[in-house]
Structures are given as C-alpha cells and as structure tokens.
Design a protein with these regions (language model features):
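Basic, alpha-helical nucleic-acid-binding regions used in initiation and control of genome expression
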Residues: 1-246
Length: 246
C-alpha cells in the first residue's frame, strides 16, 4: 500500500527510525505501518516510492543494500526494543542514525557523548510506539535533552561497531577486531564486559544481553577499556579471574 506522504530514505538512516518517520509523516502509528506490510526491504520501498527515481548506482543504493544485508545476516545484532539517540545529532539533522539501533552502540563517536534512552522529563524509557520521531510520548523534545560526555575508549568502541557494518577506509580503532564481523565483535564485547567485572565469578549464570543503557554501559565501558589497552588489560583480566571464586 502506498501512503499519501512518501519521505525519501536517507544515507545513514536506521531501518526502524525510517519507518517511524514514515508513520509520523502520514499521521499513523508505527504498528499500522507494519500491518500494512511496509517493511524495510529495498524491493518494497522502491515499489512504494520511498526511494529516489535515480536510486540505482548511487551512494544511497550502496548504503541501503549494505544495511538490508546486515539486518538479514546479523539480525540479532540490532537493538530494536529500546530506542536511543544523540540529541546533538538530532539538532543538526532530524533523522534516526542506523548506528543507534546497534546492540552495544552506547555512545556517539562524533560528539563523544553517551546516547540517551530515557526521557529527562518523564523519566520513562523511549518507545518506538511514540507518535513523533523527535519527541517522547510525553511530548518532550528529544533534541534539547542533555547528553553526558563518555570515555574515549567507549567512543572508539562505537567507531569499531560502525566500521563492522559499513567498512570504510578509516583505520580501525582496535586492531584486534579487524578479522571479525559485527556479530562476533558484539559477542566479544559481551564476554569482555562480563568477565572483566571483578565482582563476577568464573561461572556467571548468563552473559548479559540488555538493550537498556543503564545496564549495557557497564559492559561496553569494561570491554572498551580492555580493547583500548590490548593485550595488557586482557592479561590483567585473566590474572584477576584466577583469584575469583568458582
């Protein structure tokens, strides 16, 4: 089904963010978009007119195909449960970046701040079911939320995650992750962040997977510091594990 207002998908935009932008433009709930069969699929978007007429052989086509492939191949690498964002990015351009939808992408590597997933007005987690891309369900403007500076190691981890989705000519922040793909890097982060915690025993009940920043920042902070000082910090982690209870 073709909707009346058809915003064009952008380079750098996230799949979930685009669908919410589409829903808002047409005064619909994002759940209605799903019921209408409008999903992030290049063939579907092209047929419905959500891609430019001169789409082929453009940077947008290359980006859209790479994103679609990553969504299919690494479906579990995405955090589509709890939205998160950088207010400074939204102030500049009103669209949802694809990186914000990645699991363990906790910081904006451009502005070097922690992302936000909880409204400072109502203190509730953001929801994809909100009616406006730029506002919380309570009506608060996301662009004026205050972000907090984050450690430089976490910034570099975010760059590494971004690089694993779309390989660039830029040098990887951590040489150790060069041979692995996105899903493998995220599992590595989860492992380092879990076992790097000195309060965790040798056999934790389960490796944490949590889409909320209040929990994931602890994993990414520990993992980023270990990767940033590799292999010294990794050896220190192993030494620490020898002295922990089983």
């Amino acid at each position: 089904m073709t909707l009346l207002i058809r915003p064009i998908f952008k380079v750098g935009e996230g799949s979930k963010g685009f669908l919410l932008r589409l829903a808002e433009a047409n005064g619909l709930d994002i759940g209605v978009i799903d019921k209408l069969g409008i999903v992030f699929d290049i063939a579907v978007l092209n047929t419905l007119g959500y891609l430019p007429a001169d789409f082929e052989n453009t940077s947008l086509e290359k980006y859209a195909k790479s994103l679609e492939n990553t969504l299919v191949v690494h479906g579990k690498s995405w955090n589509h449960k709890v939205p998160r964002f950088c207010p400074q990015c939204l102030q500049r351009d009103a669209y949802w970046r694809y990186e914000w939808e990645l699991l363990f992408f906790d910081a904006c590597h451009e502005h070097q701040v922690w992302l936000i997933d909880r409204c400072s007005e109502c203190y509730q987690l953001l929801s994809w079911k909100r009616s406006s891309l730029m506002r919380c369900t309570c009506g608060a403007d996301l662009r004026v939320q205050q972000a907090v500076r984050c450690p430089k190691a976490v910034v570099r981890l975010s760059k590494a995650l971004s690089h694993q989705v779309f390989v660039t000519n830029n040098e990887l922040p951590f040489y150790i992750v060069a041979p692995i793909n996105l899903a493998q890097l995220q599992r590595f982060v989860r492992m380092l962040g879990t076992y790097g915690d000195s309060t965790v025993g040798l056999m934790p009940k389960r490796l944490k997977v949590n889409e909320e920043l209040v929990n994931s920042w602890q994993l990414t902070s520990l993992a980023a510091e270990i990767l940033d000082q590799w292999p010294k910090s990794f050896h220190m982690m192993l030494d620490s594990m020898q002295n922990r209870p089983g």
